[in-house]
Amino acid sequence: MNDSPVLVVGLGNPGPKYVGTRHNIGFEVVEELVGRNYANFSVHKRSNTEIAQLPGLIVAKPRSFMNLSGTPIRALCDFFKISPANVLVVHDELDLDFGQVKLRQGGGDHGHNGLKSTSRSLGTKDYWKLSVGIGRPPGRMDPATFVLKPFSKQEQDSVPIMAADAADLIEEHIRTL
């Protein structure tokens, strides 16, 4: 790993209204990662985020809405001098079955507005993305409505396991850098 820290950002929407929704699975993953390292988040005013600093790693939750996530991510990169190649963004993914996780570098945003904002602000799509599968909406439900709904009672039991699996994958990935 080079001298630059790795920035891991969980995407989600701020506020109690969005806690437990599919769109906030990125927050759940980074909260798991920070919690297992006995660390805490604190406000980083210059970037409008909450961050936790671990050895060689900065973990963040933007305090902006999902569609505006790129601005605080860019502010963190500038403040901590982190290149996009050392950024990993954790996000919900409609095109993966519930519970699946997939790590990739670069590539498209799959219509995800948080990733679009991040790519626009970083000036590149060449950063790491950890997609956490939330599945497709049932029937003809609008995907925008689906992602803002809480997980079903049946799914809620699996969310901590999903978050732990995703956090495991992040830790494995960081060891390879």
From Swiss-Prot:
Superkingdom, natural source: Bacteria
Main localization of the protein described in the UniProt heading: cytoplasm
Annotated site location: Stabilizes the basic form of H active site to accept a proton: D92
Ligand binding (tRNA): Y18, F65, N67, N113
EC number: 3.1.1.29
Catalytic reaction equation(s): an N-acyl-L-alpha-aminoacyl-tRNA + H2O = an N-acyl-L-amino acid + a tRNA + H(+)
Site residues, Discriminates between blocked and unblocked aminoacyl-tRNA: N13
Family: Belongs to the PTH family.
Known role: Hydrolyzes ribosome-free peptidyl-tRNAs (with 1 or more amino acids incorporated), which drop off the ribosome during protein synthesis, or as a result of ribosome stalling. Catalyzes the release of premature peptidyl moieties from peptidyl-tRNA molecules trapped in stalled 50S ribosomal subunits, and thus maintains levels of free tRNAs and 50S ribosomes.
Annotated protein name in UniProt: Peptidyl-tRNA hydrolase
Lineage: Bacteria, Bacillati, Actinomycetota, Actinomycetes, Mycobacteriales
